[in-house]
Protein backbone atom coordinates (compact mmCIF):
# COMPACT_ATOMS: atom_id res chain seq x y z
CA UNK A 1 0.00 0.00 0.00
CA UNK A 2 1.38 3.41 -1.02
CA UNK A 3 1.96 6.35 1.30
CA UNK A 4 -0.25 9.32 0.42
CA UNK A 5 1.80 12.35 -0.68
CA UNK A 6 2.47 14.48 -3.76
CA UNK A 7 4.99 11.91 -5.07
CA UNK A 8 2.35 9.15 -5.15
CA UNK A 9 -0.80 11.19 -5.89
CA UNK A 10 -1.46 14.18 -8.14
CA UNK A 11 -1.63 17.57 -6.42
CA UNK A 12 -2.49 20.71 -8.38
CA UNK A 13 -0.55 23.85 -7.45
CA UNK A 14 -2.83 26.88 -7.04
CA UNK A 15 -2.33 30.42 -5.71
CA UNK A 16 -2.54 30.69 -1.92
CA UNK A 17 -5.57 32.92 -1.35
CA UNK A 18 -7.12 31.52 1.85
CA UNK A 19 -5.81 31.42 5.43
CA UNK A 20 -7.63 28.80 7.50
CA UNK A 21 -7.43 28.79 11.30
CA UNK A 22 -8.19 25.20 12.22
CA UNK A 23 -7.20 21.80 10.84
CA UNK A 24 -9.82 19.56 12.42
CA UNK A 25 -12.30 17.16 10.86
CA UNK A 26 -15.11 19.67 10.40
CA UNK A 27 -13.19 22.26 8.36
CA UNK A 28 -11.51 19.57 6.25
CA UNK A 29 -14.82 17.81 5.47
CA UNK A 30 -16.86 20.98 5.02
CA UNK A 31 -14.97 24.14 4.00
CA UNK A 32 -12.04 22.44 2.24
CA UNK A 33 -14.45 20.06 0.47
CA UNK A 34 -16.45 23.11 -0.69
CA UNK A 35 -13.27 24.84 -1.94
CA UNK A 36 -12.25 21.62 -3.74
CA UNK A 37 -15.58 21.62 -5.59
CA UNK A 38 -15.25 25.33 -6.41
CA UNK A 39 -11.77 24.70 -7.85
CA UNK A 40 -13.05 21.76 -9.91
CA UNK A 41 -16.18 23.46 -11.26
CA UNK A 42 -15.41 27.21 -11.41
CA UNK A 43 -12.45 29.51 -12.03
CA UNK A 44 -11.93 30.04 -8.27
CA UNK A 45 -8.43 28.49 -8.51
CA UNK A 46 -7.35 28.93 -4.89
CA UNK A 47 -5.43 26.99 -2.28
CA UNK A 48 -5.56 27.12 1.51
CA UNK A 49 -2.80 27.66 4.06
CA UNK A 50 -3.82 26.00 7.32
CA UNK A 51 -2.81 27.64 10.60
CA UNK A 52 -3.02 25.53 13.75
CA UNK A 53 -4.87 27.75 16.25
CA UNK A 54 -3.49 26.08 19.39
CA UNK A 55 -0.05 24.71 20.25
CA UNK A 56 -0.92 21.01 19.94
CA UNK A 57 -2.69 19.91 16.78
CA UNK A 58 -2.54 17.99 13.51
CA UNK A 59 -0.31 20.04 11.21
CA UNK A 60 2.54 17.50 11.42
CA UNK A 61 0.18 14.73 10.29
CA UNK A 62 -1.11 16.95 7.48
CA UNK A 63 2.37 17.87 6.28
CA UNK A 64 3.47 14.21 6.43
CA UNK A 65 0.84 13.56 3.71
CA UNK A 66 1.64 16.81 1.84
CA UNK A 67 -1.79 17.97 3.07
CA UNK A 68 -3.61 15.39 0.93
CA UNK A 69 -6.50 13.37 2.40
CA UNK A 70 -9.86 11.85 1.44
CA UNK A 71 -13.40 12.78 2.39
CA UNK A 72 -15.78 9.82 2.69
CA UNK A 73 -19.36 11.00 2.13
CA UNK A 74 -22.03 8.60 3.36
CA UNK A 75 -25.80 8.92 3.36
CA UNK A 76 -28.87 9.35 1.21
CA UNK A 77 -29.06 11.71 -1.76
CA UNK A 78 -32.57 11.98 -3.25
CA UNK A 79 -33.31 8.54 -1.83
CA UNK A 80 -30.18 6.89 -3.27
CA UNK A 81 -27.47 5.49 -0.98
CA UNK A 82 -24.13 7.26 -1.49
CA UNK A 83 -20.75 6.10 -0.16
CA UNK A 84 -18.06 8.07 -2.01
CA UNK A 85 -14.36 8.85 -1.52
CA UNK A 86 -12.85 12.10 -2.81
CA UNK A 87 -9.21 13.15 -2.61
CA UNK A 88 -8.98 16.74 -1.34
CA UNK A 89 -5.92 18.63 -2.60
CA UNK A 90 -6.71 22.25 -1.69
CA UNK A 91 -4.38 22.70 1.31
CA UNK A 92 -0.97 23.86 0.09
CA UNK A 93 0.77 23.72 3.50
CA UNK A 94 0.03 23.71 7.21
CA UNK A 95 1.77 25.94 9.77
CA UNK A 96 2.17 25.83 13.54
CA UNK A 97 2.52 29.51 14.55
CA UNK A 98 3.95 28.43 17.92
CA UNK A 99 7.07 27.11 16.16
CA UNK A 100 6.75 28.92 12.80
CA UNK A 101 5.63 32.40 13.79
CA UNK A 102 7.73 34.17 11.12
CA UNK A 103 6.15 32.07 8.36
CA UNK A 104 2.73 32.68 9.90
CA UNK A 105 3.21 36.48 9.87
CA UNK A 106 4.58 36.37 6.30
CA UNK A 107 1.14 35.17 5.15
CA UNK A 108 0.05 38.80 5.67
CA UNK A 109 2.68 39.90 3.14
CA UNK A 110 1.26 37.79 0.29
CA UNK A 111 -0.65 40.26 -1.92
CA UNK A 112 -3.06 37.65 -3.35
CA UNK A 113 -4.37 36.57 0.09
CA UNK A 114 -8.10 37.36 0.21
CA UNK A 115 -9.99 35.12 2.67
CA UNK A 116 -9.72 34.03 6.29
CA UNK A 117 -11.83 31.07 7.46
CA UNK A 118 -11.88 29.69 11.00
CA UNK A 119 -13.30 27.05 13.29
CA UNK A 120 -11.63 27.35 16.67
CA UNK A 121 -14.60 25.94 18.70
CA UNK A 122 -17.23 27.99 20.51
CA UNK A 123 -14.59 29.00 23.08
CA UNK A 124 -12.20 30.19 20.36
CA UNK A 125 -13.75 33.61 19.75
CA UNK A 126 -12.86 35.17 23.08
CA UNK A 127 -10.94 38.21 24.29
CA UNK A 128 -7.87 37.45 26.41
CA UNK A 129 -6.48 40.69 27.88
CA UNK A 130 -3.20 38.90 28.66
CA UNK A 131 -2.37 38.74 24.91
CA UNK A 132 0.31 41.20 23.77
CA UNK A 133 1.00 42.55 20.29
CA UNK A 134 4.59 41.21 20.38
CA UNK A 135 3.58 37.71 21.53
CA UNK A 136 4.82 35.15 19.02
CA UNK A 137 1.97 34.38 18.57
CA UNK A 138 -0.91 35.77 20.67
CA UNK A 139 -2.62 32.88 22.47
CA UNK A 140 -6.20 33.65 21.37
CA UNK A 141 -7.46 33.23 17.80
CA UNK A 142 -8.79 36.84 17.56
CA UNK A 143 -5.42 38.00 18.92
CA UNK A 144 -3.52 36.10 16.19
CA UNK A 145 -5.90 37.46 13.55
CA UNK A 146 -5.43 41.05 14.77
CA UNK A 147 -1.63 40.59 14.64
CA UNK A 148 -1.94 39.31 11.06
CA UNK A 149 -4.27 42.13 9.96
CA UNK A 150 -2.05 44.82 11.52
CA UNK A 151 1.04 43.39 9.79
CA UNK A 152 -0.83 43.38 6.47
CA UNK A 153 -1.98 46.97 7.01
CA UNK A 154 1.64 48.09 7.61
CA UNK A 155 3.10 45.95 4.80
CA UNK A 156 0.81 47.53 2.18
CA UNK A 157 0.73 51.03 3.73
CA UNK A 158 -3.00 50.96 4.39
CA UNK A 159 -3.89 49.97 0.79
CA UNK A 160 -7.64 49.30 0.94
CA UNK A 161 -7.48 46.81 -1.92
CA UNK A 162 -5.50 44.48 0.37
CA UNK A 163 -8.27 43.93 2.93
CA UNK A 164 -9.44 40.43 3.82
CA UNK A 165 -12.86 38.73 3.75
CA UNK A 166 -13.36 36.79 7.00
CA UNK A 167 -15.79 33.86 7.44
CA UNK A 168 -15.87 32.42 11.00
CA UNK A 169 -17.52 28.97 11.23
CA UNK A 170 -17.61 28.68 15.03
CA UNK A 171 -20.99 27.48 16.35
CA UNK A 172 -21.99 30.81 17.88
CA UNK A 173 -25.08 32.71 16.72
CA UNK A 174 -23.85 35.81 14.81
CA UNK A 175 -20.25 34.60 15.11
CA UNK A 176 -19.02 37.34 12.76
CA UNK A 177 -20.37 40.08 15.01
CA UNK A 178 -18.62 38.53 18.03
CA UNK A 179 -15.30 38.14 16.18
CA UNK A 180 -15.39 41.73 14.91
CA UNK A 181 -16.16 43.03 18.39
CA UNK A 182 -13.21 41.05 19.81
CA UNK A 183 -10.81 42.41 17.15
CA UNK A 184 -11.85 45.95 18.12
CA UNK A 185 -11.01 45.08 21.74
CA UNK A 186 -7.47 44.12 20.67
CA UNK A 187 -7.09 47.26 18.53
CA UNK A 188 -7.90 49.32 21.64
CA UNK A 189 -5.84 47.18 24.05
CA UNK A 190 -2.76 47.40 21.83
CA UNK A 191 -3.31 51.06 20.86
CA UNK A 192 -3.10 50.26 17.13
CA UNK A 193 -4.57 53.63 16.19
CA UNK A 194 -7.58 55.10 14.43
CA UNK A 195 -6.05 54.76 10.95
CA UNK A 196 -5.71 50.98 11.33
CA UNK A 197 -9.20 50.77 12.84
CA UNK A 198 -10.58 52.65 9.83
CA UNK A 199 -8.69 50.38 7.40
CA UNK A 200 -10.08 47.30 9.17
CA UNK A 201 -13.60 48.77 9.07
CA UNK A 202 -13.50 49.81 5.41
CA UNK A 203 -11.14 47.32 3.72
CA UNK A 204 -12.04 44.10 5.57
CA UNK A 205 -15.36 42.30 6.04
CA UNK A 206 -16.17 39.98 8.94
CA UNK A 207 -19.35 38.06 8.11
CA UNK A 208 -21.59 35.90 10.31
CA UNK A 209 -22.08 32.37 9.01
CA UNK A 210 -24.15 29.31 9.90
CA UNK A 211 -22.68 25.89 9.09
CA UNK A 212 -24.52 22.58 8.96
CA UNK A 213 -23.05 19.16 8.19
CA UNK A 214 -22.71 16.15 10.47
CA UNK A 215 -19.04 15.08 10.46
CA UNK A 216 -18.45 11.87 12.46
CA UNK A 217 -14.71 12.24 11.73
CA UNK A 218 -12.07 9.52 11.36
CA UNK A 219 -13.79 6.22 10.39
CA UNK A 220 -12.01 3.89 12.84
CA UNK A 221 -14.42 1.01 12.21
CA UNK A 222 -14.06 1.13 8.41
CA UNK A 223 -10.51 2.46 7.97
CA UNK A 224 -8.90 -0.85 6.93
CA UNK A 225 -11.50 -1.37 4.18
CA UNK A 226 -11.20 2.27 3.06
CA UNK A 227 -7.39 2.08 2.80
CA UNK A 228 -7.72 -1.19 0.86
CA UNK A 229 -10.14 0.46 -1.56
CA UNK A 230 -7.95 3.56 -1.98
CA UNK A 231 -4.66 1.64 -2.06
CA UNK A 232 -3.26 4.58 -0.07
CA UNK A 233 -2.24 4.67 3.59
CA UNK A 234 -4.36 7.75 4.35
CA UNK A 235 -4.41 8.47 8.09
CA UNK A 236 -6.52 11.61 7.71
CA UNK A 237 -9.67 10.21 6.08
CA UNK A 238 -12.70 12.11 7.35
CA UNK A 239 -16.27 10.83 7.17
CA UNK A 240 -19.24 13.18 6.66
CA UNK A 241 -22.88 13.09 5.67
CA UNK A 242 -24.01 14.19 2.17
CA UNK A 243 -26.00 17.20 3.36
CA UNK A 244 -24.17 20.51 3.62
CA UNK A 245 -25.37 24.05 4.19
CA UNK A 246 -23.35 27.23 4.63
CA UNK A 247 -25.35 30.41 5.18
CA UNK A 248 -23.23 33.58 4.94
CA UNK A 249 -24.60 36.96 6.00
CA UNK A 250 -22.84 39.05 3.34
CA UNK A 251 -23.61 41.23 0.30
CA UNK A 252 -23.61 40.00 -3.30
CA UNK A 253 -20.19 41.56 -4.03
CA UNK A 254 -18.73 39.02 -1.60
CA UNK A 255 -20.72 36.19 -3.22
CA UNK A 256 -19.16 37.11 -6.60
CA UNK A 257 -15.69 36.61 -5.12
CA UNK A 258 -16.68 33.26 -3.57
CA UNK A 259 -18.75 31.66 -6.40
CA UNK A 260 -19.92 28.52 -4.59
CA UNK A 261 -23.32 28.75 -6.31
CA UNK A 262 -21.65 28.19 -9.70
CA UNK A 263 -20.31 24.89 -8.35
CA UNK A 264 -23.86 23.79 -7.44
CA UNK A 265 -23.12 23.95 -3.72
CA UNK A 266 -25.59 24.67 -0.93
CA UNK A 267 -23.89 27.96 0.04
CA UNK A 268 -26.28 30.88 0.51
CA UNK A 269 -25.36 34.56 0.72
CA UNK A 270 -28.21 36.27 2.56
CA UNK A 271 -29.03 39.66 4.15
CA UNK A 272 -29.70 38.03 7.55
CA UNK A 273 -28.61 34.71 9.04
CA UNK A 274 -31.35 34.81 11.72
CA UNK A 275 -34.23 33.15 9.79
CA UNK A 276 -31.92 30.30 8.74
CA UNK A 277 -30.79 29.82 12.33
CA UNK A 278 -34.46 29.70 13.34
CA UNK A 279 -35.21 27.25 10.49
CA UNK A 280 -32.46 24.86 11.63
CA UNK A 281 -33.52 25.00 15.30
CA UNK A 282 -37.20 24.55 14.37
CA UNK A 283 -37.06 21.94 11.57
CA UNK A 284 -33.96 19.93 12.52
CA UNK A 285 -33.59 20.18 16.30
CA UNK A 286 -37.32 20.62 17.08
CA UNK A 287 -38.47 17.35 15.46
CA UNK A 288 -35.59 15.46 17.14
CA UNK A 289 -36.79 16.61 20.57
CA UNK A 290 -40.37 15.31 20.21
CA UNK A 291 -39.58 12.31 18.00
CA UNK A 292 -37.20 10.78 20.55
CA UNK A 293 -39.58 10.19 23.50
CA UNK A 294 -42.46 9.19 21.19
CA UNK A 295 -40.20 6.67 19.44
CA UNK A 296 -38.62 5.40 22.65
CA UNK A 297 -41.98 4.81 24.35
CA UNK A 298 -43.11 3.01 21.17
CA UNK A 299 -40.22 0.54 21.59
CA UNK A 300 -37.96 2.13 18.94
CA UNK A 301 -34.32 2.93 19.77
CA UNK A 302 -32.84 4.46 16.59
CA UNK A 303 -33.88 7.66 14.79
CA UNK A 304 -33.76 6.02 11.35
CA UNK A 305 -36.04 3.18 12.48
CA UNK A 306 -38.47 5.72 13.94
CA UNK A 307 -38.69 7.52 10.57
CA UNK A 308 -39.24 4.20 8.77
CA UNK A 309 -41.98 3.08 11.21
CA UNK A 310 -45.48 3.17 9.68
CA UNK A 311 -46.99 5.07 12.64
CA UNK A 312 -44.10 7.03 14.18
CA UNK A 313 -42.83 7.97 10.70
CA UNK A 314 -46.21 9.58 9.93
CA UNK A 315 -46.10 11.36 13.30
CA UNK A 316 -42.75 13.04 12.60
CA UNK A 317 -43.90 13.99 9.09
CA UNK A 318 -47.00 15.63 10.59
CA UNK A 319 -44.97 17.57 13.18
CA UNK A 320 -42.52 18.84 10.56
CA UNK A 321 -44.73 19.57 7.55
CA UNK A 322 -48.14 20.34 9.10
CA UNK A 323 -47.10 22.04 12.34
CA UNK A 324 -43.57 23.44 12.67
CA UNK A 325 -43.26 24.49 9.02
CA UNK A 326 -46.42 26.59 9.40
CA UNK A 327 -44.70 28.74 12.04
CA UNK A 328 -41.72 29.94 9.95
CA UNK A 329 -41.50 33.02 7.74
CA UNK A 330 -39.43 31.73 4.83
CA UNK A 331 -40.60 30.72 1.32
CA UNK A 332 -42.67 27.51 1.54
CA UNK A 333 -40.75 25.68 -1.21
CA UNK A 334 -37.45 26.45 0.52
CA UNK A 335 -38.82 25.14 3.85
CA UNK A 336 -40.20 22.01 2.17
CA UNK A 337 -36.84 21.24 0.54
CA UNK A 338 -35.03 21.76 3.87
CA UNK A 339 -37.51 19.50 5.72
CA UNK A 340 -37.10 16.78 3.06
CA UNK A 341 -33.31 17.04 3.45
CA UNK A 342 -33.70 16.71 7.22
CA UNK A 343 -35.72 13.51 6.81
CA UNK A 344 -33.02 12.09 4.52
CA UNK A 345 -30.46 12.92 7.20
CA UNK A 346 -32.59 11.20 9.86
CA UNK A 347 -32.77 8.16 7.52
CA UNK A 348 -29.00 7.94 6.96
CA UNK A 349 -28.29 4.16 6.79
CA UNK A 350 -24.70 4.72 7.95
CA UNK A 351 -25.61 6.40 11.25
CA UNK A 352 -27.30 4.60 14.16
CA UNK A 353 -28.46 7.66 16.12
CA UNK A 354 -29.77 6.44 19.48
CA UNK A 355 -32.94 8.30 20.54
CA UNK A 356 -31.84 8.17 24.20
CA UNK A 357 -28.75 10.26 23.32
CA UNK A 358 -31.10 13.08 22.26
CA UNK A 359 -33.34 12.91 25.32
CA UNK A 360 -31.03 14.44 27.93
CA UNK A 361 -32.31 17.90 28.95
CA UNK A 362 -35.54 17.34 27.00
CA UNK A 363 -37.52 20.07 28.81
CA UNK A 364 -35.05 22.93 28.11
CA UNK A 365 -34.70 21.63 24.54
CA UNK A 366 -38.49 21.66 24.10
CA UNK A 367 -38.59 25.19 25.53
CA UNK A 368 -36.15 26.57 22.93
CA UNK A 369 -36.95 24.34 19.94
CA UNK A 370 -40.67 23.46 20.09
CA UNK A 371 -42.51 25.79 22.46
CA UNK A 372 -42.07 28.88 20.22
CA UNK A 373 -43.66 26.90 17.35
CA UNK A 374 -46.53 25.72 19.57
CA UNK A 375 -47.33 29.33 20.50
CA UNK A 376 -47.11 30.67 16.93
CA UNK A 377 -49.25 27.78 15.62
CA UNK A 378 -51.92 28.48 18.25
CA UNK A 379 -51.87 32.17 17.39
CA UNK A 380 -52.15 31.58 13.63
CA UNK A 381 -54.51 28.60 13.56
CA UNK A 382 -56.58 29.16 16.70
CA UNK A 383 -55.89 25.62 17.92
CA UNK A 384 -53.05 23.70 19.54
CA UNK A 385 -50.71 21.59 17.34
CA UNK A 386 -51.56 18.02 18.35
CA UNK A 387 -48.17 16.54 17.45
CA UNK A 388 -46.18 19.05 19.51
CA UNK A 389 -48.55 18.65 22.47
CA UNK A 390 -48.19 14.86 22.30
CA UNK A 391 -44.39 15.26 22.16
CA UNK A 392 -44.53 17.20 25.44
CA UNK A 393 -46.77 14.54 27.03
CA UNK A 394 -44.31 11.87 25.84
CA UNK A 395 -41.41 13.67 27.54
CA UNK A 396 -43.43 13.89 30.79
CA UNK A 397 -44.32 10.18 30.53
CA UNK A 398 -40.68 9.20 29.91
CA UNK A 399 -39.71 10.80 33.23
CA UNK A 400 -42.22 8.56 35.01
CA UNK A 401 -39.92 5.58 34.41
CA UNK A 402 -41.37 2.09 34.56
CA UNK A 403 -41.35 -0.49 31.77
CA UNK A 404 -41.91 -0.15 28.01
CA UNK A 405 -44.40 -2.28 26.08
CA UNK A 406 -41.49 -4.50 24.94
CA UNK A 407 -40.45 -5.11 28.56
CA UNK A 408 -37.39 -2.82 28.51
CA UNK A 409 -36.90 -0.80 31.69
CA UNK A 410 -37.28 2.98 31.24
CA UNK A 411 -34.40 4.68 33.06
CA UNK A 412 -34.70 8.47 32.73
CA UNK A 413 -31.58 10.52 33.38
CA UNK A 414 -31.52 14.28 33.80
CA UNK A 415 -30.72 17.15 36.15
CA UNK A 416 -31.64 16.29 39.78
CA UNK A 417 -34.19 19.12 40.07
CA UNK A 418 -36.09 17.82 37.00
CA UNK A 419 -35.93 14.22 38.21
CA UNK A 420 -37.15 15.20 41.69
CA UNK A 421 -40.01 17.35 40.37
CA UNK A 422 -41.31 14.60 38.08
CA UNK A 423 -40.91 11.95 40.77
CA UNK A 424 -43.01 14.03 43.19
CA UNK A 425 -45.70 14.77 40.60
CA UNK A 426 -46.04 11.19 39.33
CA UNK A 427 -46.20 9.98 42.96
CA UNK A 428 -49.58 11.76 43.26
CA UNK A 429 -51.06 9.27 40.79
CA UNK A 430 -53.09 12.13 39.26
CA UNK A 431 -52.41 13.14 35.64
CA UNK A 432 -54.16 16.49 36.20
CA UNK A 433 -51.63 17.32 38.94
CA UNK A 434 -48.76 16.03 36.78
CA UNK A 435 -49.79 18.22 33.82
CA UNK A 436 -50.40 21.30 35.96
CA UNK A 437 -47.19 20.82 37.96
CA UNK A 438 -44.90 20.44 34.94
CA UNK A 439 -46.51 23.33 33.04
CA UNK A 440 -46.28 25.56 36.14
CA UNK A 441 -42.51 25.00 36.53
CA UNK A 442 -41.16 28.48 35.77
CA UNK A 443 -37.63 27.18 36.48
CA UNK A 444 -38.01 25.19 33.23
CA UNK A 445 -40.17 27.45 31.06
CA UNK A 446 -39.55 30.95 32.43
CA UNK A 447 -43.35 31.29 32.67
CA UNK A 448 -46.47 29.35 33.70
CA UNK A 449 -47.59 27.36 30.66
CA UNK A 450 -50.96 26.64 32.28
CA UNK A 451 -51.81 30.13 30.98
CA UNK A 452 -51.71 28.89 27.37
CA UNK A 453 -55.39 28.28 26.48
CA UNK A 454 -56.26 24.58 26.40
CA UNK A 455 -52.71 23.29 26.95
CA UNK A 456 -53.21 21.80 30.43
CA UNK A 457 -56.30 19.84 29.35
CA UNK A 458 -54.62 18.67 26.12
CA UNK A 459 -51.49 17.45 27.93
CA UNK A 460 -53.62 15.67 30.58
CA UNK A 461 -55.69 13.96 27.87
CA UNK A 462 -52.53 12.70 26.14
CA UNK A 463 -51.04 11.51 29.45
CA UNK A 464 -54.25 9.58 30.16
CA UNK A 465 -54.28 8.07 26.67
CA UNK A 466 -50.62 6.96 26.88
CA UNK A 467 -51.31 5.30 30.27
CA UNK A 468 -54.48 3.56 29.04
CA UNK A 469 -53.77 2.68 25.39
CA UNK A 470 -50.00 2.93 25.04
CA UNK A 471 -47.94 5.31 22.92
CA UNK A 472 -48.58 3.85 19.46
CA UNK A 473 -52.38 3.88 19.81
CA UNK A 474 -52.20 7.45 21.15
CA UNK A 475 -50.12 8.52 18.13
CA UNK A 476 -52.61 6.87 15.76
CA UNK A 477 -55.35 8.95 17.38
CA UNK A 478 -53.84 12.25 16.18
CA UNK A 479 -52.88 11.22 12.64
Curated annotation (Swiss-Prot):
EC top class, as a word: oxidoreductase
SUPFAM superfamilies, sorted: 6-phosphogluconate dehydrogenase C-terminal domain-like (SSF48179), NAD(P)-binding Rossmann-fold domains (SSF51735)
Catalytic activity: D-altronate + NAD(+) = keto-D-tagaturonate + NADH + H(+)
Alphabetized Pfam families for the sequence: Mannitol_dh, Mannitol_dh_C
Keyword set, alphabetical order: NAD, Oxidoreductase
Pathway in which this enzyme or protein is active: Carbohydrate metabolism; pentose and glucuronate interconversion
UniProt GO molecular function: mannitol-1-phosphate 5-dehydrogenase activity; tagaturonate reductase activity
BP term (GO), one: mannitol catabolic process
Family: Belongs to the mannitol dehydrogenase family. UxaB subfamily.
Name assigned to this protein: Altronate oxidoreductase
Gene source species: Phocaeicola vulgatus (strain ATCC 8482 / DSM 1447 / JCM 5826 / CCUG 4940 / NBRC 14291 / NCTC 11154)
Amino acid sequence: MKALNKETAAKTQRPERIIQFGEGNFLRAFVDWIIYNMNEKTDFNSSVVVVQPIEKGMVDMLNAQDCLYHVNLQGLDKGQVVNSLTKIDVISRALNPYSQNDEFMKLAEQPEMRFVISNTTEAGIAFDPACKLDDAPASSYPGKLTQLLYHRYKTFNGDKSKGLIIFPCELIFLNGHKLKETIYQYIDLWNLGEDFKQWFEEACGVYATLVDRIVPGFPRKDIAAIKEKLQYDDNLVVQAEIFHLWVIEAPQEVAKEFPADKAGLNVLFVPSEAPYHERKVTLLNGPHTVLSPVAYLSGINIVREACEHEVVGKYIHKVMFDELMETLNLPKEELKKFAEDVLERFNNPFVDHQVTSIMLNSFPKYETRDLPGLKVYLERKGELPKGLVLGLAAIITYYKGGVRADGAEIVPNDAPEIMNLLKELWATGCTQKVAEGVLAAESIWGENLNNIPGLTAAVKADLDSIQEKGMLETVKGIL
